[in-house]
Curated annotation (Swiss-Prot):
Belongs to the influenza viruses hemagglutinin family. Major glycoprotein, comprises over 80% of the envelope proteins present in virus particle. The extent of infection into host organism is determined by HA. Influenza viruses bud from the apical surface of polarized epithelial cells (e.g. bronchial epithelial cells) into lumen of lungs and are therefore usually pneumotropic. The reason is that HA is cleaved by tryptase clara which is restricted to lungs. However, HAs of H5 and H7 pantropic avian viruses subtypes can be cleaved by furin and subtilisin-type enzymes, allowing the virus to grow in other organs than lungs. Residues 1-17 form the signal peptide. This is Hemagglutinin. Its main location: virion. It holds the Pfam family Hemagglutinin. Glycans are attached at residues 27-28, 40, 71, 104, 142, 172, 286, 304. GO terms for biological process: clathrin-dependent endocytosis of virus by host cell; fusion of virus membrane with host endosome membrane; fusion of virus membrane with host plasma membrane; virion attachment to host cell.
Amino acid sequence: MKAKLLVLLCAFTATDADTICIGYHANNSTDTVDTVLEKNVTVTHSVNLLEDSHNGKLCRLKGIAPLQLGNCSIAGWILGNPECESLFSKKSWSYIAETPNSENGTCYPGYFADYEELREQLSSVSSFERFEIFPKESSWPNHTVTKGVTAACSHKGKSSFYRNLLWLTEKNGSYPNLSKSYVNNKEKEVLVLWGVHHPSNIGDQRAIYHTENAYVSVVSSHYNRRFTPEIAKRPKVRGQEGRINYYWTLLEPEDTIIFEANGNLIAPWYAFALSRGFGSGIITSNASMDECDAKCQTPQGAINSSLPFQNVHPVTIGECPKYVRSTKLRMVTGLRNIPSIQSR
């Protein structure tokens, strides 16, 4: 009987009490998030996960400066366009920065074979050793190495040519068959570049090479091609009706590359022993270089952020937040900002 009376008293006390609010405190937050089912849901607390700002500059990455090509393209830099001479002393970099419309590329018109693949290969290179693969003064005693210049590659108002290639021409009225080889003893991949000249008429062919039926052969363990010059009149480009087609290969350590020709060879002068590095890359950007250091570089500018996501640019180099297309990305750390009231 006493137990029943106690229950009744408790029930009476509860119904006579004030209204009880069950839940959490609302606040003045205007944070909104999108959920799977709803958009613009107001919540009490949330944190931003998305970085949307940059400094608009090219910066060093972890203290290492980039290779800024300026008015030179990848082609102009690696072939040795004389207008890119200031870049030849650069041996290491954190990344390569190229402008969208570089003026100095292939100064003598022609086709650059597998150019995009070469860019891809160079994007993983963080340093190289530029060295004479075939020294100019001693490698070609039966050919002229000083007359192969052109107004298309002029430098300081004078006809010139690529600094990494040699245009071999006749000597004393003849162009003897040549055969030259190089063994890669660098213990690294070596990038070798060369060209094949295609004159615009048979008169130029005879005058420069003293042969009408020329060929160029290039052979290594992984490369084997024979080139035949195509003599034809073409529209003038940079004042030239002739063309030079450019080629390259990667030579593995201890491998041998052999060049044979009886004319029309644009011979390698300098080659590059490559060192690949994690985190290197190539970006195309109009941003200017600044005295700054960053962990993440984009074509728009550098990002210094600890946030996990960014929407600045999909192309990044370094330790970067993951790119997303979203304009807003927040993580909810609270609840809906709507009070819930129940009466008992």
